[in-house]
UniProtKB/Swiss-Prot annotation:
CDD domains: ASKHA_NBD_OSGEP_like_euk. A divalent metal cation binds at H114, H118, Y135, D329. This is tRNA N6-adenosine threonylcarbamoyltransferase. The gene is KAE1. One of its GO terms (cellular component) is cytoplasm. The keyword Nucleus applies.
Length: 371
């Protein structure tokens, strides 16, 4: 059985093809192709521009995936697409492409939850059996555990996602979005030597990142490290952040010098990743798990994997993570989750093949897993 998966919930358009042998053998990745919309430094990606990018590239990527997989249309059993969550216009573009292929090829559709796609691909690649899942990306931050055919959310962000926090600080510093702003933050952080105190906000199993972002934006503006316009206008600084800016300048002047861009990136990573380690460890203790699976684009971060590994080993456990081929948004994860659902008899009718920006992880009935 062969499934093709289309992913395009944000700025990455992915097409993947996976084979599940009829004899029950090991699944095999036949193709995994991706193209990214990269916005200029200091800017995020607008939904309309991202959707335009997806519409431009989707046909080329589908053709390239079929060629790489060395299969024809007749070999495909189902077409899987990201139903949500994500950005509206990009999701609509991919859903439209999936519906078009379904009509042209005469194949069944399968709508897939983006997060469930990450989880199932992570389980397949790493072999993790029943881990606590830390799902960290530009749009989502969740701590998840499986129970009774649902992926249950134990904790999550109360405001913005951790990846969004890192990406927006990259915009503040006016650094490149190529290959990804979070990746460039990580590279700068490796050169940082000074830990700057930042707000640390964990509330039970939940966390918050907007206050940390406001604080570090204020520091960057105060030190003249932010983008030119923001440095001049102090865009978006709250009253508390402005006070923090003045206090911090005085503090670091007294200590003999101010932090560098690298120090700020290092400090931001250390703070937000410590928060993620804390809530993940709490979930492990609650369910008695010794496994952690990190999925989502931020899961590629080597420092996050290192910090999580230290915690897990102290508990006699292990951390599982994938490389950028499968951690960053991709089409093969949608194909994997979709084919698992398809094998249980699940399909999405053409008239129901919509998309939604809000599609909770725990809304999905995970029929393919046994208790």
């Amino acid at each position: 059985m062969i499934a093709i998966g289309l992913e395009g919930s944000a700025n990455k358009l992915g097409v993947g093809i996976i084979l599940h042998p009829d004899n029950g053998g090991e699944p095999r990745v036949l193709a995994n192709i991706r193209h990214t919309y990269v916005s200029p430094p200091g800017e995020g990606f607008l939904p309309k521009d991202t959707a335009k990018h997806h519409r431009k590239w989707v046909v080329s990527l589908v053709k390239a995936a079929l060629k790489e997989a060395e299969i024809g249309v007749s070999d495909v059993d189902c077409i899987c697409y990201t139903k949500g969550p994500g950005m509206g216009p990009p999701l609509q573009s991919v859903a439209l492409a999936a519906r078009t292929l379904s009509l042209l090829w005469g194949k069944q559709l399968v709508g897939v939850n983006h997060c469930v796609g990450h989880i199932e691909m992570g389980r397949y690649i790493t072999g993790a059996q029943n881990p606590i899942v830390l799902y960290v990306s530009g749009g989502n931050t969740q701590v998840i555990a499986y129970s009774s055919q649902r992926y249950r959310i134990f904790g999550e962000t109360l405001d913005i996602a951790v990846g969004n926090c890192l990406d927006r600080f990259a915009r503040t510093l006016h650094i490149s979005n190529d290959p990804a702003p979070g990746y460039n933050i990580e590279q700068l952080a490796k050169k940082g030597k000074r830990l700057v105190e930042l707000p640390y906000t964990v509330k039970g199993m939940d966390c918050s990142f907007s206050g940390i972002l406001a604080a570090i934006d204020a520091l960057a503006a105060a030190y003249g490290l932010s983008g030119d316009q923001q440095a001049k206008e102090n865009i978006g600084l709250t009253e508390d952040a402005l006070k923090l800016k003045v206090d911090s300048v005085d503090k670091y002047n007294n200590e003999g010098g101010i932090p560098t861009r690298e120090d700020l990136c290092f400090s931001l990573q250390e703070t937000v990743f410590s928060m993620l380690v804390e809530i993940t460890e709490r979930a492990m203790a609650h369910v008695g798990s010794r496994e952690v699976l990190i999925v989502g684009g931020v899961g590629c971060n080597e420092r996050l994997q290192e910090m999580m590994g230290i915690m897990a080993r102290d508990r006699g456990g292990n951390v599982f993570a994938t490389d950028e081929r499968f951690c960053i948004d991709n089409g093969i994860m949608i194909a994997q989750a979709g084919i698992l659902a398809y094998k249980t008899g699940f399909t999405t009718k053409l008239e129901d093949s919509t998309c939604t920006q809000r599609f909770r992880t725990d809304e999905v009935f995970v029929q393919w897993r046994d208790d």
